[in-house]
């Protein structure tokens, strides 16, 4: 909470490997907030597409797949527990093939719009640290605090190596480069910092340093802001 006691909506965006998940999880614990990882929802949909042999390129079919699936996020101290149709797929969605699939399903505007509505429902009550790629620009454009994390490419590759099972440095470097291009150039919610976001390069910062910096930004919010619209910009 800020000084007024209001539960804030804190948006943390950035590319793969910038440290979003680790930072958001640690920050949420310190604040007593929920931590919601929007990317896990795309990973769950990608996994469902893999399991049902669905094409990543068919927008309409993917949208129907999303609508017919039960994708749930359960906040935990170390991140989110991801449930797909009642099954815990938290580990499976971290594997390389699912990560690559998530990047492909997320480019479709209709899929993103459906996901955005679900994500707004999850965070609308405040008291949430929500991380992803378009939280501050699309999901909650009027979030109380907006952070955009970035890091040097080699640092991001090293971090992803610690997260993804069955991946190599060379494969991850290529994947990150391709994903950056896809994320930044997509028509629906491209990956860009919100105009009012604080941009932090985490390349040479520890997790504690980044969390402390964000806590200072939150503390500088001197008074409660009225609950804002969740309409996209």
Predicted regions and their residues:
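N-terminal phosphate/diphosphate-binding loop that engages ATP/GTP or pyrophosphate donors
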Residues: 29-95
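Glycine-rich phosphate-binding loops of nucleotide-dependent enzymes
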Residues: 146-153, 163-164, 199, 206-221
């Amino acid at each position: 909470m800020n000084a007024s006691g209001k539960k804030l909506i804190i948006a943390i965006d950035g590319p793969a490997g910038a440290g979003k998940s680790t930072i958001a999880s640690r920050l949420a614990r310190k604040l007593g907030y929920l931590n919601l990882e929007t990317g896990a929802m795309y990973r769950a949909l990608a996994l469902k597409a893999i399991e049902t042999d669905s094409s990543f390129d068919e927008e309409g079919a993917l949208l129907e797949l999303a609508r017919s699936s039960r994708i749930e996020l359960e906040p935990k101290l170390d991140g989110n527990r991801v449930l797909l149709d009642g099954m815990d797929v938290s580990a499976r969605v971290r594997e390389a093939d699912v990560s690559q699939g998530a990047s492909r399903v997320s480019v479709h505007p209709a899929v993103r719009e459906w996901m955005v509505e679900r994500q707004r429902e999850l965070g609308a009550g405040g008291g949430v640290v929500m991380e992803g790629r378009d939280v501050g620009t699309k999901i909650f454009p009027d979030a109380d605090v907006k952070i955009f994390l970035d890091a040097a490419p080699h640092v991001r590759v090293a971090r992803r190596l610690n997260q993804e099972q069955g991946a190599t440095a060379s494969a991850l470097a290529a994947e990150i480069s391709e994903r950056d291009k896809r994320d930044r150039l997509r028509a629906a919610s491209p990956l860009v910092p919100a105009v009012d976001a604080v941009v932090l390069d985490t390349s040479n910062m520890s997790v504690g340093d980044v969390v402390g910096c964000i806590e200072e930004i939150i503390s500088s919010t001197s008074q409660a802001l009225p609950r804002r619209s969740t309409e996209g910009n």
